[in-house]
From Swiss-Prot:
InterPro entries noted in UniProt: Ribosomal_bL32, Ribosomal_bL32_bact, Ribosomal_zn-bd
Keyword Ribosomal protein: yes
Family label: Belongs to the bacterial ribosomal protein bL32 family.
Entry GO CC: large ribosomal subunit
Pfam entry (one): Ribosomal_L32p
Keywords from the named record: Ribonucleoprotein, Ribosomal protein
Keyword Kinase: no
Taxonomy of the source species: Bacteria, Pseudomonadati, Pseudomonadota, Gammaproteobacteria, Vibrionales
The protein's name in its UniProt record: Large ribosomal subunit protein bL32
Bias (Basic residues): 1-16
Gene Ontology molecular function: any one: structural constituent of ribosome
Native species: Photobacterium profundum (strain SS9)
Any single biological process term in GO: translation
Length: 56
């Protein structure tokens, strides 16, 4: 197992963890169906930018 040579300070620990924050997903509402979806993704009904692109 790897063992550190010396204890890391609280500042070094905090700097390492500064990039670990989670962000919320960008959600949009479709203009045609009013359904929420991820940005730049097709809705579950098959709409993208107000047009039907996938027929189920």
């Amino acid at each position: 197992m790897a063992v550190q040579k010396s204890k890391k300070s609280r500042a070094a620990r905090g700097m390492r963890r500064s990039h670990d924050a989670l962000t919320t997903a960008a959600v949009s509402v479709d203009s045609a169906s009013g359904e929420t979806h991820l940005r730049h993704h097709v809705t579950a009904d098959g709409f993208y930018r107000g047009r039907k692109v996938i027929n189920k």
